[in-house]
Amino acid sequence: DLELLSLHVDGQAYRHFELHAKELVLHDLPSAFDLEITCSNNPLQNTSLMGLYVSSGNFFTQCEAEGFRKITYFLDQPDVLTLFTVKLTAAKKDYPILLSNGNLIQEEELSDDRHSATWEDPFPKPSYLFAIVTGKLAVLEKIITTQSGKEKLLQIWVEEKDLSKT
C-alpha cells in the first residue's frame, strides 16, 4: 500500500491533485514540468514479488509488467519514458551493496554506519525497466570487449551461495 508523503512540481509543493485508492490525479499542470513524488510503502510486507519487496534479507524490484505502481504513483505504461536518478541509503552492515539502473555517480559514507549510492540512468526508460537491488551480494566480474573495440566491465551480482552458478 502506498502512502503519499509529498508532491512537488518544479520544486514547489503542489496541492492541485486528487488521491484515490489506486491513482493520483494531478490538475492544472504546466505543459512542461519536473515532478517529484515522495511516498512510503512497506516492502517487508509485500509478498506479491511485484514492486519493491524483500527476499532472503535483500531488497529487490520486479516492475514488469505493472509492478512499478506498487512503488510510487506513476504513468506506468511502456510509452512513458523517464530518466531515473536513484539515491539508495542503508545500513552498510546489512546492505553493503546498493545497485540501480545506469551509472554510479556518487558513493558516500554516512554517520551511524550507513552509506549511500546515487545512480543516474542517462537513457529514458519505461517504468517496467526500473531496478533496485540491495543487500549482501557477491560479484563475478569480467572485462569484455565490445564489437567497437571498447573495453567494458561486466558484473554479475548474486547471493554468495549462488556465485558458483554464474
Map each language-model feature to its residues:
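A surface-exposed beta-strand-loop module
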Residues: 2-55, 112-113, 118
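Residues that cap or initiate secondary-structure elements
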Residues: 3, 13, 30-32, 41-45, ...
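Hydrophobic helix-coil surface modules that form long, contiguous segments used
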Residues: 77-166
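Glycine/proline-rich low-complexity spacer/linker segments in large multi-domain proteins
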Residues: 20-22, 38-88, 135-144
